[in-house]
């Protein structure tokens, strides 16, 4: 049996340790990595800053062999020893679990310990393109990562490197100075609504699949229990989550399935759901219909780090910058893919 050798690091900028790079004859060595580091104490289901973090605790690699017209399922490898904070692992396939030589696609999937995704459990001969992650309803999203590569498995042994990226988007809303009374009406809810939502994502390409088309409130804050000072809500308390905010601010966010051609609406609402004031969200080019993409971060207001209000640096450009709902009429959403990039969106 070929023995497994591996290493794990909890920070993405740690120096690489010295490891044995040899490949046992006839075996396959998987080098698997996630692109984001661990952030201790942050929630896995909620998003409180633009920090790119991860809490992957279980990883599987699916092998799909080339049958001449498609890549079809052959075998699954469950990568042992992956714990919360691991960003790299080397896994050697055991002697009795080798693949025949040939052309393969490999799909690595990384998940949290208690997510609500159902991931396709492929049967022999099933197409590579059929690999999906599904939730029962919008709001059940959390972190899920995947990555894919094509490689030749050789009789003498092969090394396969797979980098996993997030297959959901992140959406954050950071606001301040929400009035209790506006136009003579009591503000009870602060909501960011998407015109459509998906419940499935293709793990091979990050494209969302619409199984139950429906509008969805990505952010839905009930303000009624908050203290009011000088007519302004004092803000939601997230100290138990390790979050530090500016005074009189509202912060909320979540992961969201990729979805195309949606509009976003920010609004203040009465207890009965009637809108008091709404803003249309735009990107920096003035477009109101856009795509929410996997591994991109969409932010109304800016919060670089959850645990402070200065972004962890002396640069004032990293300071918290919540949208002021008393004065701001144009509101920018930043869209970031690093997550990969941060995009600016505007509300009017």
Regions found by a protein language model. Give the residues of each.
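Beta-strand secondary-structure signal
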Residues: 27-31, 60, 105-107, 159-161, ...
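Tryptophan-paired
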Residues: 50-121, 181-294, 341-348
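Bacterial Sec-dependent N-terminal signal peptides
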Residues: 3-33, 173, 295, 300
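Structured interaction patches on ligand/partner-binding surfaces of diverse proteins
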Residues: 113-161, 274-297, 304-307
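Structural motif
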Residues: 33-53, 174-183
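Low-complexity, acidic Ser/Thr/Pro-rich "mucin-like" tracts of secreted and single-pass surface proteins
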Residues: 26-28, 32-36, 229, 236, ...
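Secondary-structure boundary elements
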Residues: 150-156, 165-169, 174-188
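N-terminal extension/subdomain marker
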Residues: 21, 36-40, 60-62, 69
């Amino acid at each position: 049996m070929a023995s497994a050798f591996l290493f794990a690091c909890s920070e993405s900028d740690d120096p690489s340790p010295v490891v044995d790079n040899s490949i046992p004859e006839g075996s396959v060595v998987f080098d698997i990595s996630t692109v984001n580091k661990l952030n201790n104490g942050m929630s896995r289901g909620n998003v409180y800053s633009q920090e790119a973090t991860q809490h992957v605790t279980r990883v599987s690699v699916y092998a799909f062999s080339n049958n001449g017209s498609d890549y079809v399922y052959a075998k699954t490898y469950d990568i042992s020893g992956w714990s919360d904070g691991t960003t790299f692992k080397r896994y050697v396939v055991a002697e009795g679990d080798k693949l025949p030589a040939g052309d393969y696609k490999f799909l690595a999937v990384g998940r949290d310990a208690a997510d609500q995704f159902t991931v396709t459990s492929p049967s022999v001969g099933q197409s590579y393109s059929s690999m999906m992650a599904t939730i029962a309803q919008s709001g059940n999203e959390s972190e899920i990562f995947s990555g894919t590569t094509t490689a030749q498995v050789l009789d003498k042994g092969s090394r396969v490197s797979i980098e996993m990226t997030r297959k959901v988007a992140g959406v954050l809303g950071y606001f301040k100075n929400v009035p209790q009374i506006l136009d003579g009406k009591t503000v009870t809810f602060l909501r960011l609504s998407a015109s459509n939502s998906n419940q499935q994502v293709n793990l091979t390409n990050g494209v969302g699949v619409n199984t139950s088309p429906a509008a969805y409130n990505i952010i839905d804050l009930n303000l009624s229990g908050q203290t009011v000072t000088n007519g302004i809500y004092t803000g939601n308390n997230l100290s138990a989550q390790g979050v530090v905010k500016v005074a009189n601010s509202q912060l909320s966010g979540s992961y969201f399935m990729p979805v195309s051609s949606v509009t976003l609406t920010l609004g203040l609402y009465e207890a009965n759901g009637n809108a008091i004031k709404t803003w249309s969200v735009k990107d920096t080019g003035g477009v109101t219909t856009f795509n929410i993409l996997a591994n991109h971060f969409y932010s109304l207001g800016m919060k670089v780090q959850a645990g402070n209000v200065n972004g962890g640096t002396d640069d004032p450009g990293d300071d918290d910058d919540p949208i002021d709902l008393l004065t701001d009429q144009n509101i920018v959403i930043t869209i970031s893919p690093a997550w990969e990039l941060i995009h600016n969106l505007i509300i009017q």
